[in-house]
Design a protein with these regions (language model features):
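Internal, hydrophobic beta-strand segments that form the core of beta-sheet-rich folds
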Residues: 1-4
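Extracellular glycoside hydrolase catalytic/binding regions
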Residues: 146, 153-204
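Active-site-adjacent substrate/metal-binding segments within catalytic domains
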Residues: 6-145, 160, 175-176
Length: 204
């Protein structure tokens, strides 16, 4: 069942009920009630095995997050294992999943076409996971030094294309980006991601 439709979704012997999340003038609401998102970030990386984690290792990792009080996770900048999405469904951890368009460049036509393919593939593969609430369109797209050309106008134009494509593929969820404040008016959710004391500023 498409995630925009409320009702039961069955996978094997389990079922989950879908409820449409809302972001209205800032606060996040789920089932009509305001919910404070307490989250973390995840890359597919584990000591000794890298990204080749077993299902047991993935379950242990996600269970630990749940025990920490996490109810929201932003996945690393690439489509992750379906096992992780299923664990988030099971554990009640809401998900921001995103594509690997990073660091302020557009590349050529092939690069942009691949970004669009990755976005539609991610949505078509994972839209039936009730845990997913956000499709991420990029990461640190305001970073000027990793590509020979840094053109804010072109980045804004392509961000609009991805935003529209995401809503064409799934109109029940919101889009988001991290950083890139000159595109914050394009997406539905903007994360300034301050990282005080790391990228800028201080801890106090």
């Amino acid at each position: 069942r498409h995630a925009g439709q409320c009702g039961p979704v069955r996978r094997g012997n389990s079922s989950a009920y879908l409820h449409l999340p809302r972001v209205e003038k800032g606060p996040f609401r789920l089932n009509g009630s305001r919910l404070l998102l307490r989250g973390t970030h995840r890359h597919e990386d584990h000591a000794g095995v890298g990204a080749a984690m077993t299902e047991e290792q993935m379950r242990a990792e996600m269970t630990l997050m749940k025990e920490m009080g996490v109810n929201f996770i932003r996945l690393g900048h690439y489509q992750q294992s379906d096992i992780i999405l299923s664990l988030c469904d099971e554990l009640g951890i809401l998900v921001w999943e995103e594509i690997p368009w990073c660091r302020g460049g557009l590349g050529g036509e092939q690069y942009q076409a691949q970004a669009k393919r990755m976005l539609t593939n991610m949505i078509h593969t994972h839209y039936n996971h009730p845990a997913v609430i956000i499709w991420g369109l990029g990461n640190e797209n305001d970073w000027p030094n990793d590509f020979p050309e840094f053109d804010k106008g072109k980045i804004r134009s392509f961000m609009k294309e991805l935003h529209e494509l995401a809503h064409q593929s799934d109109d029940s969820r919101v889009t988001a980006i991290r950083r890139c404040d000159f595109c914050k008016d394009i997406v539905d959710v903007y994360s300034p991601s301050i990282w005080a004391g790391w990228y800028r500023g201080c801890l106090l």
